[in-house]
Amino acid sequence: MISKAETKQFTQKSSYYWEGNPVLEKKVNQNFTGKYSLVDLCCGAGGLSKGLSDTKKIVPILGVDIFTEALKTYKLNNPMTSTILGDVRQIDDEMYKEAIGDTAVDIVAAGVPCQGFSLANLKRNVEDERNFLFLEVVRFIKLFNPKVVIIENVSGMRSLGNGEFEKAIAEALSGSGTKGYNVKRELLNAADFGVPQIRKRLIFVGVRKDIKEEFNFPNPKFDNIDMPYTTIQDALSDLPVLKNNEEKTVYASSPKSTYQKCMRNNVVNNKLYNHKSPNHPKTTIERIKNTVPGKPMYENYKQRIRLAWDIQSPTQLAGGIRPQFQFGHPDQSRGLSIRERARIQSFPDDFIFVGGTVQGRVQTGNAVPPLLAKNIGDSVLKVLGEKNE
């Protein structure tokens, strides 16, 4: 069993969280004529921004996060987007106005930190201060009155406070800004939209009340009957074999599935990033080797399985209880590389993660799957229509 000391270690604030004053890195807003502007609060590595921008009609103009390594990843993959590093509760109105300038904010999105809600969290409770960060989204709405608000969180929010917390968020969004919002909420499973992972997320979408079109959540596209779910084999089978603590930087084969072709669509010069295996002790290597694919590697941690080729991954986590590598590879005696974790989250291979193995796990585990975000974005665009400027 995990000890009290280990429990404390995995629930304390990470040293990678910025504790200084908020820092703005201002970029000249790119030309986005005919596209909608996006501000991504609590942006993390950028899964929401990536998926929404993949609609080709939405452009991120500002990303905000307290996690230093995640924001480095965000900036690397969004080089024309302004960023603020810091606690959203410490960012004053003037800094937001300086960051955004004269640009009208069309969409604000927030993957509000989930540790206070998540069923995986050892300290889950209604008093956790992180549960109230959504009020910072409300403050932002009052400043900029965006057309659409998107908030993402884990399914565990539904049961927090016997459902009262979920209701309170919807009511707070409904009355926000100068005109208020028509708010809908839905529990979506990323696997239903092509992500090779069972990842259920509670999504709130608010559309400003002066916009007459009604928002509807996207219908599932995969059902394992007419459109089979994406499997681990679909996602990972083209990536090079790795030994313990080995890195490979070029592909060894062509894509073997439609999903892999999508992941490699923008790869340049066959260059492969973030594909390094963890450095396991011999005991861990033997444990993975002796575990049947699809079964738990540890008796006390049923979600810590060795993946099988023909399934979807259970929900990826950012860290927490041991073993931190979380999943074993289906036919190699090791945990997953960051690239494999990114594939399971539907990040394409040209999306590069900054930081080492542990930070890569945190960033991929916290992220919104871009494929899920894109489907939400497509539904939002049905409401907004073409932007005329």
Segments from the language model and where they lie:
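N-terminal intrinsically disordered, compositionally biased regulatory/targeting segments
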Residues: 1-15
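Proline-centered helix-kink/hinge sites
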Residues: 79, 112-113, 146, 196, ...
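Class I S-adenosyl-L-methionine
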Residues: 94-102, 115, 119-297
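Core alpha/beta nucleotide-donor-binding catalytic domains of modification enzymes
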Residues: 11-41, 45-145, 155-159, 164-166
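Generic recognition of flexible, low-complexity loop/linker segments
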Residues: 27-28, 192, 301-305
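C-terminal target-recognition/interaction regions appended to catalytic cores
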Residues: 2-5, 254-389
